[in-house]
């Protein structure tokens, strides 16, 4: 099992945003997607390379921080948040619906939260072959006209080796593609639907602290069939990192 799929997916994402930049009149949309994806991917790669697994989940990293330890997971959380905030500012420049400074600030905060929550949610799913890549394709397919096409293409390209169990997206690829799709959602949706999307992503992130997504999927016949679709052989586990 190799983690090389993650950097390759990140490179494919950035190449796709570069092409999108040439086709887009203003270029701001593709830059926002690239900023979110690159930032999340880089800190994810750091966690892949140097991460310690003794602290898991957001609460675990907070407990470690209170004890004076800055974990690689907390560095990733901060890095994903910072890149999401930068992307949210660029998203706001693409938007004309906010006429007041207060509206722009609130809108940017919502976009930041949505992008970061989506990035982490996709990463939480990267525990079985093809699961995270399938989620990117499902979430991003309806957003290809808003900057998600590079993420969908990168996920589709990684799917064969991922499903075969030869490689995985890891924190680098999963966070990068998740952040890119989250940015596309921020670009595409009105604030009411962005709020609902964030609420759903945040709820799932919080639920992961107590509930095993894999166990839920295994107990649900439809989800189990979709999860196993295209998988060549049963795999017990792809990663020891089952939380952020």
Map each language-model feature to its residues.
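"…together with the soluble PPM/PP2C metallo-phosphatase catalytic core" -> "…together
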Residues: 1-211, 215
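Membrane-proximal soluble regions of multi-pass membrane proteins
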Residues: 200-244
């Amino acid at each position: 099992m190799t983690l090389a799929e993650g950097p390759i997916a990140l490179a494919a994402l950035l190449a796709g945003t570069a092409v999108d930049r040439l086709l887009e009149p203003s270029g701001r949309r593709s830059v926002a997607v690239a900023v979110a994806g690159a930032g999340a991917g880089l800190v994810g790669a750091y966690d892949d390379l140097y991460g310690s697994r003794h602290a898991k989940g957001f609460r675990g990293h907070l407990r470690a921080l209170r004890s004076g330890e800055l974990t690689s997971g907390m560095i990733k959380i901060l890095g994903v948040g910072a890149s999401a905030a930068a992307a949210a500012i660029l998203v706001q420049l693409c938007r004309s619906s906010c006429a007041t400074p207060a509206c722009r600030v609130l809108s940017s905060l919502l976009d930041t939260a949505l992008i970061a929550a989506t990035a982490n949610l996709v990463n939480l799913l990267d525990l079985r072959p093809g699961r995270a890549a399938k989620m990117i394709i499902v979430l991003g397919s309806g957003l290809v006209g808003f900057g998600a096409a590079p993420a969908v293409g990168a996920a589709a390209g990684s799917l064969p080796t991922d499903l075969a169990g030869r490689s995985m997206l890891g924190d680098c690829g999963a966070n990068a593609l998740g952040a890119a799709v989250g940015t596309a959602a921020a670009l595409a949706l009105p604030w009411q639907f962005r709020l609902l999307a964030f609420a759903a992503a945040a709820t799932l992130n919080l639920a992961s602290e107590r509930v095993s997504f894999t166990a839920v999927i295994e107990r649900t016949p439809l989800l189990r069939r979709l999860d196993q679709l295209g998988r060549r052989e049963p795999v017990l586990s792809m990663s020891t990192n089952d939380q952020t």
